[in-house]
Amino acid sequence: MKKVGLISLGCPKNQVDSEIMLGHLTKAGFTLTNKENEAEIAIVNTCGFINDAKEESIERIIEAGRLKENGSCKALIVAGCLSERYKEELTKELPEVDAFIGISEMEKIADVCNALIELHNAGAQRTVPLQEPVSRILINPQHYAYVKISDGCNNRCSYCTIPSIRGSYKSREIETIINEVEQLASKGVKEINIVAQDTTDYGLDIYKKRKLSALLKGLVKIKKLFWIRLLYTYPEHFDDELINIIASEEKICNYIDIPIQHIDDEILRKMKRNSSEKQIRGLIERLRRRIPDIVLRTSLIAGFPGETEAQHKRLYDFVKETGFHRLGVFAYSKEEGTAASRYKNQITQKIKDRRRNEIMRLQSKISLNKNRELIGKTLKALINGLSSESELLIEGRYYGQAPEADGVVYINDGTGLDKIRAGDFVNVKITEAHQYELVGKVI
């Protein structure tokens, strides 16, 4: 048997790519293993988005390279964004790697593996990407999955390398996405998390108009699917039709991830974002008016080149005033090849970290207060299984908690706990609240 081990790094979109590669490998007769010392071929699917992600990818590649000396590994393959972006440089710097395959070559993973294991020889020709994946092998628990509705991006944010790595926006057809989700639901997936670089831009390239609402109308008809969650939406592409379908369809979680990055109009202009403070505030007001129990998540960049203390304070005050349920802050990362990397008035790492930490400390208080508002309420929770914290706790999530990104609900009391399994839905009364986690009992 040919055994393959895969290390998946980066965002949920990269995880979907990993699952597609595993599907190709399984179809080609490879055996998958999560024991690195047993793998004949090691694959590292890398992330190249920001410096921290690149450093982690390099570290994991070097670790995997040691398996060729100390384990049964015969070949090492590096895939993903880092390979796409720095293939020539990495070939020189990492001679232990047998093959580098880019974003558009992942459907050839089985062919590359067969060639390497037989010949111990690198090589992968650039090919036209397959739009539709084979049946995926899920990395995460089997009751939820990420579904990538497009690849690439047409936004040209000044700090971002994604368009140069993954190209322009390429939507998948509605019918093929629905077919994939039907297959996932038939295998026990209860929740899908829709991902793309910009989910709200979906369909414009192939249908000449944005079609996320139409896609959602098709997905809600899938009988065995219970939760649909929208991630990576853009404020400038949100329309009333989309808000109305989220509000009216029970299966669509009242949870929206809207990365706004900043609130100051001058900074947004330098970021080459197409949104404005007025537009962002208006969208949040419309969402909360139409969907009173909506959970909003966003991400911000602290210390963008030229950001003044006054602009930072404006962002801080906006976060305090708005009260997002979930929020992440990244210290600005200077990425080569981007417009922002050439901007003057680059800010020191010390100041960037301070500004990030100030907002995160504020957000921890907001998150705690938001969670305290849930004490005494009964929420439907999707069970993950026994908690990694303690076998005495069962772990689940309510609609306001996205997998991996947000906190969880710990269940420590109630009837029928011994009969609860991963993938079950149960009603949980919240009894305790912490900054990011909730505690409750089954009722």
Map each language-model feature to its residues:
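Generic beta-strand/beta-sheet core signal
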Residues: 7, 195-197, 231-233, 259-261, ...
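Short, hinge-like loop/turn segments at secondary-structure boundaries
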Residues: 94-95, 117-119, 210-212, 246-248, ...
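Conserved SAM/AdoMet-binding glycine-rich loop
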Residues: 75-80, 85, 90, 186-314, ...
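Conserved, mostly hydrophobic/aromatic
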Residues: 157, 177, 194, 230, ...
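Terminal RNA-binding accessory module
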Residues: 342-443
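Radical SAM enzyme [4Fe-4S]-AdoMet core and its adjacent flexible, acidic
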Residues: 11, 203-220, 224, 270-271, ...
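Proteins enriched for Cys/Gly/acidic motifs involved in redox and nucleic-acid/cofactor modification
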Residues: 1-202, 241, 256, 278-285, ...
